[in-house]
């Protein structure tokens, strides 16, 4: 016997996110009535994660579904929603949820105008597009935006997929998405740069060296926040910071690299936060910034760690 409140779900976009969320909703006993898949990879993904679900045209999916999940790139979302509105595809009372981190429900105004219910359900995790993502959803948080009266519906859908909903105000969606992108996307760049440096000096498996350090650092940062801050910048060790900056300047000059710029930006941000926490005096902060900009020793020639 089917559970009450089960929906006919249509998935628009069988990319890594859409196919997995469709499978999660199906596991919660919702009926996936159709999926759109353009590329060969997306068709194969749909066949693997949503076996037996018909691959349909987008308008046919919207016509059949009580819940439409729009799992498409941010830049395509607005045009898709407006195009379907012009075709008269949206139905009164229909639930329409997009998975974009950047947008709230404002971009779904054509949906609202047709009497359908707009929801924004963004999973804060990276996806492989494979079944292992279904297990990872159990540790995932969704950024959820909806009208106040509809927020419980959005939250319930997330809980049914095994994840944790967190309400994000419409006005805060861009900051929310920027925070996640800054933490996740830029970490990949940071690891790539550090691995490149180690590989250049002969470390055969830089990932093996960095892995334990990065995992411990991440765990400490999540558990303790800025109290977990360590290293030469937080200690005011200007000599070491200066040596780092000079070495990276020389490395970038020879390799055409971009490491120094990233190191400078993050070290300056770290120094400001260390100063705000009282770990650095203003003079130390100035010397750190001078060392980062010039790669030279501070004007007094002393390591600012003295007196710490």
Task: Tell what function each PLM region has.
Residues 30-31, 116, 163, 203:
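Short phosphate-binding/catalytic loops that engage adenosine nucleotides
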Residues 1-63:
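NAD(P)+-binding Rossmann beta1-loop-alpha1 motif at the extreme N-terminus of oxidoreductases
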Residues 272-308:
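NAD(P)-dependent dehydrogenase/reductase Rossmann-like domain
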Residues 218-284:
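Interdomain hinge/lid region at the active-site interface
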Residues 45-49, 111, 132-223, 252-254, ...:
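Internal alpha-helical scaffold of NAD(P)-dependent oxidoreductase catalytic cores
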Residues 33-37, 96-99, 144:
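Short, hydrophobic beta-strand segments that form beta-sheet elements in well-ordered domains
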Residues 40, 44, 54-132:
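Rossmann-like NAD(P)(H) cofactor-binding subdomain of soluble oxidoreductases
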């Amino acid at each position: 016997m089917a559970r009450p409140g089960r929906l006919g779900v249509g998935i628009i976009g069988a990319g890594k996110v859409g196919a997995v969320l469709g499978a999660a909703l199906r596991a919660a006993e919702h009926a996936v009535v159709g999926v759109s898949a353009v590329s060969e990879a997306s068709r194969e993904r749909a066949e693997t994660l949503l076996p037996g679900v018909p691959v349909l045209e987008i308008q046919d999916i919207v016509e059949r579904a009580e819940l439409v999940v729009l799992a498409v790139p941010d830049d395509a979302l607005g045009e898709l929603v407006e195009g379907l509105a012009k075709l008269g595809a949206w139905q009164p009372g229909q639930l329409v949820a997009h998975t974009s981190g950047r947008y709230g429900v404002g971009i779904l105004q054509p949906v609202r105008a047709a009497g359908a219910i707009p929801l924004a359900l963004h999973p804060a995790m990276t996806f492989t597009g494979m079944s292992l993502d279904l297990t990872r959803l159990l540790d995932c948080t969704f950024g959820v935006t909806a009208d106040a009266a509809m927020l419980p519906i959005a939250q319930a859908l997330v809980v049914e997929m095994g994840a944790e909903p967190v309400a994000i105000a419409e006005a805060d969606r861009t900051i929310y998405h920027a925070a996640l992108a800054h933490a996740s996307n830029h970490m990949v760049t940071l690891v790539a740069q550090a691995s490149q440096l180690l590989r250049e000096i002969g470390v055969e498996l830089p990932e093996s060296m960095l892995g334990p350090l990065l995992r411990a650092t991440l765990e400490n940062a999540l558990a303790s926040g800025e109290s977990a801050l360590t290293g030469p910048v937080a200690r005011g060790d200007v000599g070491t910071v200066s040596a780092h900056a000079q070495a990276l300047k020389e490395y970038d000059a020879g390799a055409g690299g971009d490491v120094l710029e990233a190191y400078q930006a993050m070290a300056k941000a770290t120094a400001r936060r260390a100063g705000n926490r009282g770990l650095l005096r203003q003079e130390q902060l100035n010397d750190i910034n001078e060392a980062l900009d010039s790669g030279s020793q501070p004007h007094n020639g002393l390591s600012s760690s003295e007196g710490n």
